[in-house]
Amino acid sequence: MSEYLQQIAKRRTFAIISHPDAGKTTITEKMLLFGNAIKTAGTVKAKKSGIHATSDWMEMEKQRGISITTSVMQFPYNGRIINLLDTPGHEDFSEDTYRTLTAVDSALMVVDAVKGVEDRTIKLMNVCRLRDTPIVTFMNKFDRDTRDPLELLDEVENILKIKCAPMNWPIGMGKYFKGVYDLYNDEVTLFETGHGHEIYPYKKIKGLANAKDAIGIDLYEDLEMEIDLVRGASHEFDEQEFLEGNLTPVYFGTALSNFGVKEMMDGFTRYAPAPQHREADQRVVAADEQKLTGFVFKIQANMDEKHRDRIAFFRICSGKYEKGMKIFHERTGKQMQISKALTFMAGEREQVEEGYAGDIIGFHNHGSIQIGDSFTQGEKLKFKGIPNFAPEIFKRVKLNDPLKMKALQKGLVQLSEEGATQVFKPFISNDLVLGAVGVLQFDVVAQRLASEYNVKCSYEGVNVTLARWIFCNDEKKLNDFKKKYEVNLAYDGAGYLTYLAPTGVNLQLAQEKNPDIIFSATREH
C-alpha cells in the first residue's frame, strides 16, 4: 500500500454525542491523555482551581464551563490518527452540533448510566440516522448508583431504535463497583479509585472463575447469572451491522476515574471506519482519489480576540492538502490560494503543512466562504448532505435605532450564512423573525451585531413554535397554498419559502390539508 493510501487508512474522524453533563468533555480529556496530547486531565467542573478542560476554550465557555463551539482535536492512538470533533453538549448549543455530525465517519455516544437516554441524545441520534453513521456507545458513571445495565440496553434499543451488542459487562455499581468483564475475551479488569488523572495499569484477571476471590462470592454469583442473561437476550457484535448503523457495540465504565475508556478506545479504533466515500450532486467521491475535494461544515467567528477573524472548518473528502496550494471555490467559480491552513488543538492553533481525507483544517475566511461550500482542484462538484436544520426557538428582532434597518438586515443575513441563527422575513409584516436551536444563540447574535455591525437590538416574543421549509413540484398548487396561508409564510435568509407555525396542531392540520406540499425540517445548504 502506498504512503498516500496508508495515511487515509489510518484516519478515524468522529464526534461525541451526548446529553449535557453525561461526561462528554471528561471522556474527551481522557482520550487526549491516551493520545499523549495532554499530560494530565483537568477536571472540567473545577473552575475555581483554574483548571479548565482543554476542549472548552472560548471566553463564554470558560465562564460557564460548557463547550459552545466545535473544537477539533487530532492525536495518534493505536497506530491510527484520530480526528475528534468536540460538539457542544450544553442546552445552549446550536446547529453547529447537528452539522458537525455531517463531517464525521462515525460517532461515540456517551450515556449517563444514572439517567439513561435523554432528550439531546435522541435528537443527535436522529441526525446520525440521516447518514446511517456507525455508533459506538459508552455507558458512563458506573462508580455511582446507576440504573440496571440490562434496563439501559433495553432503553437504547427501544428509544433510539438501534440494536445493542455489549462488549463488556459491569461488575456491581456505585460503591460496590468492582470492574468490568470482557464478554469476548473472558477477562476481568478490576476497578480502583483515585486514578482519574493518569493512565493506570488496572489489574486484569484471565478467566471469570479466577476472579471469584477478587470480586467476592455474592457479586460473582450475580455476575454469572447476568452474563447468562445477557448472552441469551442481547445481540452478538456484527461488524457489518455496525458499519451500516444498525447495531452499536456497548462499553461500560467511568470516564472520571479513567476506567473502561481504554477498552472503548481500543474497540473504537479497531472497528470504526476509515474515511468514507461522499455523495456529490454530480457523482460519488471516493476517499482515495488523488485530487483534493472537501466541504465547509462550520464557520467560527472571532476564534482569536487578537485576530478578529473568521475560520471556515473544512472536511477533506479526498486527495491531499499541501501548504500554499490553489483550490477552486465551486459556488463562486473562483480560485483561492490557501497559504495558511490551520489545525486546532482546542484554541491552540498550528499551521498545517499537509492534510488527508478525514482531516479537518481551517481556512481564514474574509466573508467569501459560506457553510456548505465545496472546494476542488478544478472540478465542478457540490457535496450533498450539509443541511440547515429547522430552528426550535423564535424571537422577533426589535431595533433600537430604526435608521439602522439596512445594517441589521445585512448583519443578520451574514450571521445566518455562518450558521449562527436563521432569519425569516414574514409575507405580511416588516418584522424580522430570528430562529435558533439554542437560547444562547440569541445572546451571541446581539453581542456580535453590536460589536461587528454597530447595531443595537433587543428581542420580544413571537407567536411561532415551529418552522418547516416548503417544497412542491406543482406550481399551481404551490401558488394556491401561498395565497391561502400567507399569514404563516416567510422567506428565510437564503430566499427559501418557510411555514412558521404557531402550534404543533396548526402545523399538523396544514400538513393534513395539503398532502402535495412537502413540509421539511431540513434543507440543503
From Swiss-Prot:
It is found in: Cytoplasm. Belongs to the TRAFAC class translation factor GTPase superfamily. Classic translation factor GTPase family. PrfC subfamily. It holds the Pfam family GTP_EFTU. Keywords: Cytoplasm, GTP-binding, Nucleotide-binding, Protein biosynthesis. Its main location: cytoplasm. GO terms for biological process: regulation of translational termination. Residues 9-276 form the tr-type G domain. It comes from the Bacteria. GTP binds at residues 18-25, 86-90, 140-143. HAMAP family: Rel_fac_3. One of its GO terms (cellular component) is cytosol. This is Peptide chain release factor 3. One of its GO terms (molecular function) is guanosine tetraphosphate binding. Increases the formation of ribosomal termination complexes and stimulates activities of RF-1 and RF-2. It binds guanine nucleotides and has strong preference for UGA stop codons. It may interact directly with the ribosome. The stimulation of RF-1 and RF-2 is significantly reduced by GTP and GDP, but not by GMP.
